[in-house]
């Protein structure tokens, strides 16, 4: 995992290395300062000339300034390296998600992916910053201070052998108690993000049912849970500071007590005042470095959850990949399902589709009907290879879809999914998702074919009118027609409408189908519908029942041979007549 994440440093290796170099310089200079301070204290005590004091003091000031410069440079390069590392992480996660198939996406919720690209990346960025700054600084300071303490202090350094283990034990205990609470916080972040995303997406439904108070209470509960767990963890971690202060004061007392006794008993031969002063500073450095190591341990363990979640995305292999020698041309819009069975995961016991054998000639109009859960959408999603079949094969233009270059195949197949989505931007910008090089004339023609031109021109800015995120400022029927126009701009060999005229009135629906027959006769048109009227003029109607083919034929044939089809048709026709 660490190796994978470290690979995201890439072009920011130099700032990372420079950070480490400057930190080593900063720590080295800081550790030398108490050594020279001891000389200054002894010089003042001995009453040497002022020039010697100024010389030693000047050296201390120079060392402090150099240490400051090294610290500033380390901070600058660390900030640059960590920001670049986070940028690369976000880029790699987003790029990986773009390569995912529907099968991959099904394993992660959208709220979880958002959390991984935001909160988790920030946590990992902070961990990286701590590693290249504090995780290097703290052990170095601990090591240098211990060495200098034993070099200078002699017997006084023995106090470290007592204080250090006590502090270390306390810090480890605090860390182990805090970590479970931090882990619980990150698990609950996803739930809160899901609540936020759900509420924002369904804001109109929430207001329509006057559920604002319920949603506020639900969000408040999720937020309170995070606050409670975070407070619990922070309360435990807060014990670090008083423990550190306690050990520091004990160390000061021991050093001063033992040092003063040694000075009195030896007449300053074993140790002097300057050395005691230095030992107090080194003791502070040692204890501070241990506290920093403890904080790093807690923070890194907290971040480990975020790192793990990022690693899961980065190491998720796309379920669909291009073959070694892909076919780069789709000959026509014919489709063949041969012994097709499909289930959404290998572990699933039940097949969503089973034993599908179906041939569709290029240029045909095919209607697909079936009850809720009959896997109509699943069937058509196999054509552009949004999923791979579990058994059997799907061929487009006489070639197995698994042999095509994915981009080539999907450019030949336009799918208007059941859940229509428009992006923030102008109507033109949205439509050019179908063909970024489409001319204004082609855009207008596609909209006329989709019966969208009239209402688009009624907007104040026409085709330059802005669409809000998700298309919230247009009606459901308008959104569907714009999505159909966008799909038509691809000039596909196969056009799939997955219940994409459900929000359109029957007259407009009929006009759209008439336009298809007149202007794109060579395109294979596959229409999933709830209304038989939307597909009764199709060249072939496919009826699905629980993922299996129930009947195939033309409208009149099915009326005569299939009782279920006839019953649904009569109900819909009778319902329409009663409504009229």
Could you describe each region identified by the protein language model?
Residues 10, 21, 25, 33, ...:
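Hydrophobic alpha-helical transmembrane segments of ABC transporter permease domains
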Residues 10, 16-73, 77, 150-155, ...:
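Transmembrane helix-loop-helix hairpins at lipid-water interfaces of multipass membrane proteins
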Residues 11-13, 99-103, 119-132, 136, ...:
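An intracellular "coupling" helix at the cytosolic face of ABC transporter transmembrane type-1 domains
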Residues 15-16, 63-82, 133-140, 161-188, ...:
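Alpha-helical transmembrane segments of multi-pass membrane proteins
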Residues 21-22, 29-42, 63-110, 114, ...:
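Juxtamembrane helix-loop junctions of ABC transporter transmembrane domains
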Residues 46-48, 83, 91-115, 119-121, ...:
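Short intracellular "coupling" helices and adjacent cytoplasmic loop segments at the cytosolic face
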Residues 48-49, 53, 58, 148-162, ...:
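Helix-loop-helix
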Residues 329-580:
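ABC-type nucleotide-binding domain
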């Amino acid at each position: 995992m660490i190796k994978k994440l470290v690979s995201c440093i890439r072009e920011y290796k130099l700032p990372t290395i420079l950070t480490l170099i400057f930190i080593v310089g900063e720590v080295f200079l800081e550790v030398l300062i108490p050594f020279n301070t001891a000389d200054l204290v002894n010089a003042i005590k001995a009453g040497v000339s002022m020039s010697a004091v100024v010389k030693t003091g000047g050296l201390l000031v120079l060392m402090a300034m150099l240490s400051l410069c090294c610290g500033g440079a380390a901070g600058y390069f660390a900030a640059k390296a960590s920001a670049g590392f986070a940028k690369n992480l976000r880029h790699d996660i987003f790029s990986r998600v773009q390569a995912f198939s529907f099968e991959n996406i099904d394993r992660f919720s959208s709220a979880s992916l958002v959390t991984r690209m935001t909160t988790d990346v920030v946590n990992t960025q902070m961990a990286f910053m701590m590693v290249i700054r504090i995780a290097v600084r703290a052990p170095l300071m601990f090591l240098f201070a211990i060495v200098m303490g034993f070099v200078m202090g002699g017997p006084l350094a023995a106090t470290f052998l007592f204080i250090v283990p006590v502090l270390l034990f306390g810090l480890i205990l605090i860390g182990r108690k805090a970590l479970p609470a931090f882990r619980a916080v990150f698990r609950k972040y996803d739930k809160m993000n899901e609540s936020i995303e759900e509420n924002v997406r369904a804001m109109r439904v929430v207001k329509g049912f006057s559920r604002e108070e319920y949603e506020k209470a639900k969000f408040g509960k999720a937020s309170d849970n995070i606050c409670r767990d975070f407070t619990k963890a922070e309360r435990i971690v807060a014990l670090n500071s008083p423990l550190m202060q306690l050990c520091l004061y004990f160390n000061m007392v021991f050093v001063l007590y033992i040092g003063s006794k040694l000075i009195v008993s030896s007449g300053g031969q074993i140790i002097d005042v300057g050395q005691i002063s230095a030992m107090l500073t080194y003791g502070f450095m040692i204890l501070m470095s241990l506290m920093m190591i403890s904080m790093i341990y807690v923070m890194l363990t907290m971040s480990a959850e975020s790192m793990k979640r990022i690693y899961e995305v980065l190491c998720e292999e796309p379920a669909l990949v291009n073959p070694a020698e892909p076919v780069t041309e789709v000959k026509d819009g014919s489709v063949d399902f041969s012994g097709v069975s499909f289930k959404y995961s290998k572990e699933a016991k039940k097949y969503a589709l089973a034993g599908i054998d179906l041939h569709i000639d290029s240029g045909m109009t095919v209607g697909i009907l079936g009850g809720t859960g009959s896997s109509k959408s699943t069937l058509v999603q196999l054509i552009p290879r949004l999923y791979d079949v579990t058994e059997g094969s799907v061929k487009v233009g006489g070639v197995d879809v698994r042999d095509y270059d994915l981009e080539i195949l999907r450019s030949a197949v336009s799918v208007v999914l059941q859940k229509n989505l428009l992006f923030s931007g102008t109507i033109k910008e949205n439509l050019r998702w179908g063909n970024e090089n489409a001319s204004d004339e082609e855009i207008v023609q596609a909209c006329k074919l989709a019966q969208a031109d009239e209402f688009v021109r009624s907007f104040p800015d026409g085709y330059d009118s802005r669409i809000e995120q998700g298309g919230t400022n247009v009606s459901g029927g308008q959104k569907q027609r714009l999505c159909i126009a966008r799909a038509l701009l691809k000039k596909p060999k196969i056009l799939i409408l997955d219940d994409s005229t459900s929000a359109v009135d029957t007259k407009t629906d009929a006009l759209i189908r008439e336009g298809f027959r007149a202007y794109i006769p060579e395109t294979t048109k596959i229409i999933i519908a709830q209304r038989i009227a939307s597909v009764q003029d199709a060249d072939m109607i496919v009826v699905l029942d629980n993922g299996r083919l129930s009947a195939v034929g033309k409208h009149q044939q099915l009326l005569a041979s299939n009782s279920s089809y006839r019953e649904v048709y009569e109900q819909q026709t009778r319902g329409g007549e009663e409504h009229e």
